[in-house]
């Protein structure tokens, strides 16, 4: 009997091992691992690419692709886009410094797009702000085909250059930063539409949405952003942590958000400016607006500035904030709690509440003469709305696939185990 029990124990042990190894099915993001775990969840399957010091050697970023790279503390790195003469192209660069690094107030990432003749198509930069807390930040570049833009209209190679804004600034450490790059294209419209931004919209500051808060845990990156829709959402956030949420906003709809940071009973006193930073990014991960919420241990809140409804013609606006609201899709809310909060009030966690309002009925958008890349990035689907209501990303069946793989492996091994047990039992009876 002892022999039979030992054999079964070995089989069940092997079953447990097989199950444990079968469950994690998500791919690991490409690129070398750093000594300190990254605070950012890179896209599964992101392709590793090394930026070139010269545009002559710049690696290609294919439209619709996601890439992982790195940015040295000094100098520029370049990448190439091969574009046609009719599509708008966008590239987002998310810079991820190590949590152990230090940054200056104005340090950040700068993204420039130029054509093969050296003409500048766009420039954008994002900084860490007064809290000087290292965290993932994103800047975007673009090549637009627009009646008001005479440059960068030719087909051919265009170059994306990425650099630090203030690598030598006081308090900035010389560490290299990880990068996530996403290249996108937006097709031209089938019909000629307005060539000026809408002149009138409701710019009154809306009242924060009321109601009981529902728990919704934030994601750790753009691709893993937790879907939410209109509502009051709460999560816990720790100093140095960054949380990502995705809100579907359709054509004609207007988003407004208030962020609240709850009080603490630590008894400590002090003040951290812009302790909670909330940034709204558009579907191309372009910066739309942000708000900083200071913290003295008591509850405090802040709201994004009033924003116009999403409209294709917003791209013709003179202000970058309005121009960024140029397409429908998932708008990202990225919340970061400054590391400095821990110095005064401890490691937390601290309760964070997001009051999200999406006003207006969805309207018909422009008729595009083709598909965007990635497909569907500039639209809101029924699946997107369902995902926002349920809090699970559309098409995210990772957990189910893990369960299926684990279940099949476990079931098969158990059947084998029971079969062996039966054989051993019969042999024992025969003896």
What are these regions (language model features)?
Residues 71-73, 77-89, 148-153, 237-239, ...:
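Extracellular and analogous surface-interaction loops
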Residues 1-11, 397-409, 424-425:
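N-terminal export and membrane-targeting signals
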Residues 87-89, 146-169, 253-255, 322-340:
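Noncatalytic modules at the cell exterior or secretory-pathway interfaces
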Residues 405-431:
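C-terminal membrane-anchoring or membrane-association module
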Residues 66, 101-141, 272-308:
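Surface-exposed beta-strand/loop patches in noncatalytic accessory domains
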Residues 26-80, 99-100, 121-135, 169-243, ...:
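Non-catalytic extracellular/lumenal accessory regions of secreted precursors
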Residues 245-401:
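Membrane-proximal extracellular "stem/stalk" segments
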Residues 88-100, 255-264:
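A short beta-strand element within beta-rich, extracytoplasmic domains
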């Amino acid at each position: 009997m002892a022999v039979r029990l030992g054999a079964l124990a070995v089989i069940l042990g092997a079953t447990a091992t097989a199950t444990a190894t079968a469950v994690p099915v998500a791919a690991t993001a490409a690129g070398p691992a750093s000594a300190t775990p990254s605070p950012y969840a890179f896209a599964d399957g992101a392709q590793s690419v090394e930026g070139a010091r010269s545009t002559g050697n710049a690696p290609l970023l294919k439209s619709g692709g996601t890439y992982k790279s790195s940015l040295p503390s000094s100098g520029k790195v370049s990448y190439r886009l091969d574009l046609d003469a009719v599509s708008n192209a966008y590239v987002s660069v998310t810079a991820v410094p190590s949590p152990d690094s230090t940054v200056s107030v104005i340090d950040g990432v700068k993204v420039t797009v130029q054509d093969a003749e050296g003409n500048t198509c766009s420039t954008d930069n994002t900084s860490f702000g007064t809290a000087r807390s290292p965290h993932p930040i994103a800047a975007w570049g673009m090549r637009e085909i627009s009646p008001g833009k005479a440059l960068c209209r030719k087909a051919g190679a265009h170059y994306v250059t990425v650099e630090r804004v203030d690598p030598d600034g006081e308090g900035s450490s010389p560490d290299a930063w990880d990068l996530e790059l996403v290249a996108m294209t937006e097709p031209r419209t089938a019909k000629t539409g307005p060539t000026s931004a809408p002149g009138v919209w409701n710019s009154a500051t809306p009242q924060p949405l009321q109601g009981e808060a529902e728990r919704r845990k934030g994601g750790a990156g753009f691709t893993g952003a937790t879907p939410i829709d209109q509502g009051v959402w709460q999560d816990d956030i720790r100093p140095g942590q960054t949380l990502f949420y995705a809100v579907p906003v359709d054509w004609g709809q207007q988003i407004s958000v208030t962020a609240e940071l709850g009080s603490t009973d630590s008894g400590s006193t002090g003040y951290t400016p812009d302790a909670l930073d909330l940034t709204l990014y558009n579907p191309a991960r372009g910066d739309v607006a942000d708000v900083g919420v200071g913290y003295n241990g008591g509850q405090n809140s802040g709201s994004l500035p009033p924003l116009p409804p999403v409209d294709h013609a917003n791209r013709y606006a003179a202000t970058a904030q309005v121009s960024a609201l140029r397409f429908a899709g998932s708008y990202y809310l990225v919340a970061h709690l400054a590391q400095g909060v821990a110095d005064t009030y401890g490691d937390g966690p601290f309760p964070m509440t997001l009051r999200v309002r999406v006003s207006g009925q969805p309207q018909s958008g422009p008729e595009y003469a083709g598909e965007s890349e990635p497909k569907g990035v500039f639209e809101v689907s029924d699946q997107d709305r369902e995902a926002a209501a349920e809090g699970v990303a559309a098409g995210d069946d990772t957990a189910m696939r893990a369960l299926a793989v684990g279940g099949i492996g476990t079931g098969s091994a158990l059947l084998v185990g029971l079969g062996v047990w039966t054989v051993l039992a019969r042999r024992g009876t025969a003896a």
